[in-house]
UniProtKB/Swiss-Prot annotation:
Record-listed Ca(2+) binding positions: Q96, D98, E104, N119, D120
Lineage: Eukaryota, Metazoa, Chordata, Craniata, Vertebrata
Top-level division of the source organism's lineage: Eukaryota
This protein's record includes keyword Secreted: yes
Source species: Crotalus atrox
The protein's name in its UniProt record: C-type lectin Cal
């Protein structure tokens, strides 16, 4: 575990919640600039979702939803992670994703679900965000 103090170590990667509010694009750029190889976080198992949810509940200062690295670039419900990892696990909130008004193409953790479930959201909305890095 080479993660800095306030980062969550999990499966060889480190995760950190940032409380400043950014658009999805700005959040991804922030993670990338933080350290080469960093991205908005990706998830691949239920256990990871739970651990992250617990971590965010402990460290997130606001009530806002939290951006993760999933988006629908082609706008056709083909979801992709920014770290190019396999989209093998999805845990949507009820009746999501819905591309509401054909405007929602970025994915956030929903605070009302304890950060366990996902919603597609307008990418220009401002949320807190979760970076994932290797140290």
């Amino acid at each position: 575990n080479n993660c800095p103090l306030d980062w969550l170590p999990m499966n060889g990667l480190c995760y950190k919640i940032f409380n400043q509010l950014k658009t999805w694009e700005d959040a991804e750029m922030f993670c990338r600039k933080y350290k080469p190889g960093c991205h908005l976080a990706s998830f691949h198992r239920y256990g990871e979702s739970l651990e992250i949810a617990e971590y965010i509940s402990d460290y997130h200062k606001g009530q806002e939803n939290v951006w993760i690295g999933l988006r629908d670039k082609k706008k056709d419900f083909s979801w992709e992670w920014t770290d190019r990892s396999c989209t093998d696990y999805l845990t949507w909130d009820k009746n999501q994703p819905d591309h509401y008004q054909n405007k929602e193409f970025c994915v956030e953790l929903v605070s009302l679900t304890g950060y366990r479930l996902w919603n597609d959201q307008v990418c220009e909305s401002k949320d807190a965000f979760l970076c994932q890095c290797k140290f």
